[in-house]
Amino acid sequence: MALPKIEDVRNLSDADLAEKIAEAKRELFDLRFQRATRQLEKPHLFKHTKHRLAQLLTVERERQ
């Protein structure tokens, strides 16, 4: 899975952006839970999810 491009995020509508932010936060929570219970098989997903969340939050902040 490649890291997402910022241009893809900038093309989202405000509603889609808010939905993607909530989705990324939930996924990060699930990954933390899996790591705590030693069920995480792909630790690189932390980096990808955090990167995607940072991009989403950056674009949200730019629009304010």
From Swiss-Prot:
GO cellular component: cytosolic large ribosomal subunit
Ribosomal protein among keywords: yes
GO biological process: translation
Keyword Cell membrane annotated: no
Coiled-coil region: none
Pfam families: Ribosomal_L29
Gene Ontology MF: a single term: structural constituent of ribosome
InterPro entries given in the database record: Ribosomal_protein_uL29, Ribosomal_uL29, Ribosomal_uL29_CS, Ribosomal_uL29_sf
SUPFAM superfamilies: Ribosomal protein L29 (L29p) (SSF46561)
Gene3D superfamilies named among the record's database cross-references: 1.10.287.310
Key words, A-Z: Ribonucleoprotein, Ribosomal protein
NCBIfam families: L29
Record-stated family: Belongs to the universal ribosomal protein uL29 family.
Protein name as it appears in the record: Large ribosomal subunit protein uL29
Organism listed in the record: Synechococcus elongatus (strain ATCC 33912 / PCC 7942 / FACHB-805)
